[in-house]
């Protein structure tokens, strides 16, 4: 974790731009191209921890300002650590397996993480 802060279980993470190649961080960029996966547990700053890069989860933290329906592609959101319904031009890294339509960043949904792809 190279974010300078803790990463929470369910946070969406990206590759950190460092030469070591083994660092992750959080982003506030919608549809970030360096999206990598989701933290499987809380990870303290400057520590290592498990990251889910593909497969099923019940832990993905999401924002529902743009309604999420089952089957929607998900990408990074403008609030660090959260995913959102991906838009055209975004990098998607997950498929929603649960709807979330509340206009907040309190959602935790089932999702299938996939190899990132530009939509």
What function would you assign to each model-found segment?
Residues 1-119:
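Extracellular receptor-binding modules and their adjoining Ser/Thr/Gly/Asp/Asn-rich linkers
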């Amino acid at each position: 974790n190279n974010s300078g802060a803790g990463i929470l279980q369910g946070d969406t993470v990206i590759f950190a731009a460092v030469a070591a190649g083994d660092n992750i961080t959080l982003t506030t960029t919608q549809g970030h191209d360096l999206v990598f996966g989701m933290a499987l547990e809380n990870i303290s700053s400057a520590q290592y921890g498990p990251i889910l890069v593909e497969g099923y989860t019940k832990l993905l933290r999401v924002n529902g300002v743009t309604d999420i329906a089952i089957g929607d592609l998900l990408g990074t959101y403008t609030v660090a650590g959260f995913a959102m319904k991906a838009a055209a031009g975004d990098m998607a890294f997950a498929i929603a397996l649960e709807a979330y339509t509340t206009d907040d960043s309190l959602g935790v949904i089932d999702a299938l993480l996939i190899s990132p792809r530009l939509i």
